[in-house]
From Swiss-Prot:
One annotated Gene Ontology cellular component of this protein: plasma membrane
Protein name according to UniProt: Elongation factor 4
GO biological process: positive regulation of translation; translation
PROSITE patterns for this protein: G_TR_1, G_TR_2
Record field: catalytic activity: GTP + H2O = GDP + phosphate + H(+)
Designated gene of the protein: lepA
Domain tr-type G: 7-189
Binding site for GTP: D19, H20, G21, K22, S23, T24, N136, K137, I138, D139
UniProt keyword annotations, A-Z: Cell inner membrane, Cell membrane, GTP-binding, Hydrolase, Membrane, Nucleotide-binding, Protein biosynthesis
Organism: Synechococcus sp. (strain CC9311)
């Protein structure tokens, strides 16, 4: 049994937007409580992945147990559960909030409240968490704590009279934060005597011990010798070890209600111990699992192909290894006439897709071609069936389908009101439907739109940042499917369909997108010795075309004057050769062409 009674345990997390200083504040808390010695300290201590440190974002959750001597002379155990701040990982955030009783709301004193922070704060309020506002970066010259306090009160309705000003960089205000966690965050409920239930809020794959599961004991207790049952996956395991994160793993014999720890039980893959699952004892199982469990559903799909065909087995192995530690990643083999063998992969969102791609290239030294991201469409066929399509190239022909439904999201954009026009223009270009506009303060506004997800996953985020000089932030969630006039746009290169360039677009946009595609390809595909026609088509109808002219060899150079029939004979021979070359010739599309098409702005 660990040494802390339930009334002296505090479980809390930090809610903050990207770049508002969450990981730095976590570092200071670890340092101030003596959990990490100063000499071992490195920046962003809880962000273990190299990629996390580099991008300055938290991808996987971490947890740390700190001991703190409070003003009343008692020693308290503070469990800090770190959360990712990005919209792609909102399910992970909701699970880690369920494991806490309180939250520090960290807001940059020079920037104010951002969209993703708000989404997480509302989630925290739904879970009845005690929220402590913290104004970070008050040492910056542009800091305006009073304005930010007003903003938090206006937007969230939180009383900010006792908000804590701090600077995570210099350590100012950190002792006050620790004391207020003890004073204001309620202790966990004393449910040691009830049947054992523990919530999995994170897990990672260790090549030697299998999956390490991070959990919070909600009721009862878990000890090292127990046999446990995971209620959602219905799998049973014998525990090898149980322990706490301080922040390095440290074995203990038992953890009771209210405590946060880890367990190892030779679990093969992260998919067997999913985030949100309930752990209970095999011989005395709980009646019902903890509420809120949901399977991770991929929202964005794309094809991943190795640039060299012989790297295919390496890519397969790398994806299998990544899947051991990332249960949200889905993939299946796919072949394409233009690209050879590869995989169709599903991701939570664009950031998740970029991270997986970057990890494959960085950790496994693979060179990849990525096709344009697409979403899942519901296709109603003429025979009454309904199928799901995640690859535009597999969409049935127009004669076979009745209608196509695409996923829609409700989006809230927070921005200074100078950029209203630019943002409304962007949303309209992306087929957005205006719902509402609210002024939060005199300077800031919230725009609420409903948009097709397909319009968001291309480059909406980049465009939003560009048009608002980086000031806007957004948050969105899926609201269901709607029927739309959608068509499959194919690209034909030398009369052959190039599958990876196939997209599904709205009929009204098809011409502009098709024209943009063929023009872009004309710039990027190198000239051959024969003419290459480039066409964009909907079904059998060509809607845009251009061609790359041939490189000509001057066959008349050696004729100097002479008989005209001799020249004609040579030109005829050349034309015949070109005709044969055109029939036999294969056009190699360079990788830049695929990449440029991804970047092609889809706005008309």
């Amino acid at each position: 049994m660990t040494d802390a009674p339930v009334k002296r345990i505090r479980n809390f997390c930090i809610i903050a937007h990207i770049d508002h200083g969450k990981s730095t504040l976590a570092d200071r808390l670890l340092q101030d409580t003596g959990t990490v010695a100063n000499r071992d300290m490195q920046e962003q201590f809880l962000d273990n992945m190299e990629l996390e440190r580099e991008r300055g974002i938290t991808i996987k959750l971490q947890a740390a147990r700190m001991k703190y001597k409070a003003a009343d002379g008692e020693e308290y155990v503070l469990n800090l559960i770190d959360t990712p701040g990005h919209v792609d990982f909102s399910y992970e955030v909701s699970r880690s909030l369920q494991a806490c009783e309180g939250a520090l709301l960290v807001v940059d004193a020079s920037q104010g409240v951002e969209a993703q922070t708000l989404a997480n704060v509302y989630m925290a309020l739904e879970n009845d968490l005690e929220i402590i506002p913290v104004l970070n970066k008050i040492d910056l010259p542009g800091a305006d704590p009073d304005r930010i306090k007003e903003e938090i009160e206006a937007i969230i309705g939180l009383d900010c009279s006792n908000a804590i000003p701090c600077s995570a960089k210099t350590g100012l205000g950190v002792p006050e934060i620790l004391q207020s966690v003890v004073d204001r965050v309620p202790p966990p409920a004393d449910t040691v005597k009830e049947p054992t239930k523990a919530l999995i809020f994170d897990s990672y794959y260790d090549p030697y011990r299998g999956v390490i599961v991070y959990f919070r004991v909600m009721s009862g207790s878990i000890s090292r010798k127990d046999k446990v049952l995971l209620m959602a996956s219905n799998k049973t395991y014998e525990l090898d070890e149980v322990g706490i994160m301080a922040p390095d793993e440290k074995k203990v014999d038992e953890l009771h209600a209210g405590e946060v720890g880890y367990l190892a039980a030779s679990i093969k893959a992260v998919a067997d111990a999913r985030v949100g699952d309930t752990i209970t004892l095999l011989n005395e199982p709980a009646d019902a699992p903890l509420p809120g469990y949901a399977e991770a559903k991929p929202m964005v799909f794309c094809g991943l192909f190795p640039t060299e065909a012989d790297q295919y087995p390496d890519l397969r192995e790398a994806l299998h290894k990544l899947q051991l530690s990332d249960a949200a990643l889905k993939f299946e083999p796919e072949t394409s006439s233009a690209m050879g063998f590869g995989f169709r992969c599903g991701f939570l969102g664009l950031l998740h897709m970029e991270i997986v791609q970057e990890r494959l290239e960085r950790e496994y030294n693979l060179d990849l071609i990525v096709t344009a991201p697409s979403v899942i469409y519901n296709v109603n066929l003429t025979n009454g069936e309904q199928i799901l399509v995640d690859n535009p190239a597999t969409l049935p022909d127009p004669q076979q389908r009745e209608s196509i439904e695409e996923p829609y999201v409700r989006m809230e954009i927070y921005a200074p009101n100078d950029f209203n026009g630019a943002l409304m223009g962007l949303c309209q270009e992306r087929r957005g439907e205006y719902l509402d506009m609210k002024y939060i303060t005199k300077e800031r506004v919230t725009l609420i739109y409903e948009l097709p997800l397909a319009e968001v996953v291309t480059d909406f985020f980049d465009q939003m940042k560009t048009r608002t000089q980086g000031y806007a932030s957004m948050e969105y969630h899926l609201i269901g499917y709607r029927k739309n006039e959608l068509v499959r746009l194919d690209v034909l290169i030398n009369a052959e369909r190039a599958d990876p360039l196939t997209t599904i677009v709205h009929r009204d946009k098809a011409y502009n997108v098709g024209k943009g595609l063929v023009e872009k390809l004309k710039e990027l595909i190198p000239r051959q010795q024969f003419k290459i026609p480039l066409q964009a088509s909907i079904g059998s109808r060509i809607i845009a075309s251009t061609s790359i002219s041939a490189i000509r060899k001057d066959v008349l150079a050696k004729c100097y004057g002479g008989d005209i029939s001799r020249k004609k004979k040579l030109l005829k021979k050349q034309a015949k050769g070109k005709k044969r070359m055109k029939a036999m010739g294969k056009v190699d599309v360079p990788q830049e062409a695929f990449m440029a098409v991804l970047k092609l702005n889809q706005t008309p």
